[in-house]
Amino acid sequence: MKVDLLTAATILVLSAALIPFATNAPAARTAAASESGTPLGPVDTYFVTQTSLGTPFQVDAGRVALAKGTTQAIRSYADLMVSSHITVNDALLAVLKNKAPVPPPTLLKASYATTVSSLQHESGSTLDADYVRGQVNYQKANAALYEYEIANGTDPDLKTFAQETLPKIQDHLARALKLQAAEK
């Protein structure tokens, strides 16, 4: 069975939908404290965890597509994903600099690693199609995650970060949709 970005993105969206009910989940119980002593709520903690998890995944998947993509458009998009996610991660780290650490993510690591491994073993138009389809699904799920943080997060710094970053995610989605349309 082939695990792809669609599977990972679906898990991300479904997990986000369950946040309000996850009061016994480790991430919900483990509230990180902000600099002011106000604890990060479960939504903020989940947001940080998922955003932190997405960065290495996007960088790794992007590097595979950058090296093996068959068109300049795919390679350019992959290069954008690598550089953009490194920049976004640096911005998130700056926001979190004076906050207590958030527990490391565990749920999706294996799924993301499997997806990157699948891409590494693909080539040609199959790799291009799977990478682009996965990007469309990932960017939709990522936009939903950021919108959820903006609407429901309690940490003002994280909400501002999400508000400033969401337009970039929407741009990434628009570019991925354009690549997908070009394949048809």
Positions of PLM-derived features:
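Hydrophobic helical h-region of N-terminal Sec-dependent signal peptides
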Residues: 10-14
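His/Met- and acidic-residue-enriched segments that coordinate or traffic transition-metal cofactors
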Residues: 3-7, 19-184
